[in-house]
């Protein structure tokens, strides 16, 4: 099971890395690409999401799972922090606390994954992506074009 969790983590990290690498050297575009990659059909597949949530549910009682899951969050957080820092500098945004913003984005991303997984109302990957992009439009209003 550890191998499965590691594989899923590497798979997600590869999608994220490719999303950033295949985007222009523009922090708003990179942020949009990074977060959109979370809702790619290869990542936000119902079966794969179910696996993630099963492992997360066991993480507290299984130190190996917790370590692997925490590594995923740390890598994601570092990528977000780097890009958001560049975006804040470029856009001269004030009063944005990067650690809190990153934690909020990660929590939202995980919550949107959960909505995809359990919704009986047809909440889909595209809905999740639209919610995230709408949020980013409000946080970074001078860069809305990247999130449309």
For the regions a language model picked out, list residue spans one by one.
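All-alpha amphipathic helical-bundle segments outside canonical DNA-binding/catalytic cores
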Residues: 67-72, 89-107
